[in-house]
């Protein structure tokens, strides 16, 4: 009974996976997102988002971004097998977010050895 409860606890507790390849420090250095037409002013680098997702979520987890912008977090989630819920109130950024997510999903499907139909 103890082992069952311990396993359940381990499954439910907040994940935090710091390791040699994903160190936890209070200073992060990531290249900024280079300017391009339509770039969101607060767009985060994919490397930084993947670092955050690797250290704080499990495979298949759901990630909520209440200020989704152009869905950089969502794109990282698609690439890392996380589910994504994004909220964006600015129509032009919402439209761009939808396009970026659709493109990321299409890319992931073609990258899979056995792409799901649909």
Indicate where each model-derived feature is located.
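Class I S-adenosyl-L-methionine
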Residues: 1-118
